[in-house]
Amino acid sequence: MPITPATSTHSSSNGTAEAILLELVDENGTTIGTAEKLAAHQPPGQLHRAFSVFLFDEQGRLLLQQRALGKYHSPGVWSNTCCGHPYPGEAPFAAAARRTHEELGVSPSLLAEAGTVRYNHPDPDSGLVEQEFNHLFVGLVQSPLRPDAEEIGDTAFVTAAELAERHAKDPFSSWFMTVLDAARPAVRELTGPSAGW
């Protein structure tokens, strides 16, 4: 399994576990340091850099993922196509493309920046806090998915109407609507007015 900011530790060359570091930022998104991943999510949370990806098929349907049950943060809930944290110093675009491939086994046929959003979302189930400066990306996926079962429990392509129905009955990540709403202008530009986003 590739070692990425989605995993909590990895083995160094001497066989010891190394913590995954996140990039801490100020309110303007300027890097101010690093923090261990779990520590950055402990209350009250530390503002750190993140990314969220929204991929659509050729019919304008959004690809959702259900987070794997084994994940320590927000397991089993539905969320956007891919989300995560760049390595310190890694460009958010590169991290978004890398993690999308690692989690879904596919590279977007198009990936474009869609702005940023800053939020603070406590997760009542885990007690963790998402205090993020999030870089948003929208794009297209045209290849068959090959999800990593350690990261993803299920996937679904949904229309805007189907998303509204699913969101009313199924659990979603605490950050999902915040990042989707912030990305909507770019989503509408990508999918066109008839898709209903």
UniProtKB/Swiss-Prot annotation:
Q: What is its EC number?
A: 5.3.3.2
What biological-process terms (Gene Ontology) are attached?
dimethylallyl diphosphate biosynthetic process; isopentenyl diphosphate biosynthetic process
The record ties this protein, via Gene3D superfamilies, to: Nucleoside Triphosphate Pyrophosphohydrolase (3.90.79.10)
The answer to keyword Metal-binding applying to this record is yes
**UniProt-annotated binding residues for Mg(2+):** 83, 103
Question: Which cofactors does the annotated protein need, by name?
Answer: Mg(2+); Mn(2+)
What is the similarity comment for this entry? Belongs to the IPP isomerase type 1 family.
Cell inner membrane among keywords = no
Q: Where is this protein localized, as stated in its record?
A: Cytoplasm
The record places domain Nudix hydrolase at 46-183
Q: What is this protein called?
A: Isopentenyl-diphosphate Delta-isomerase
Give the originating organism.
Answer: Streptomyces avermitilis (strain ATCC 31267 / DSM 46492 / JCM 5070 / NBRC 14893 / NCIMB 12804 / NRRL 8165 / MA-4680)
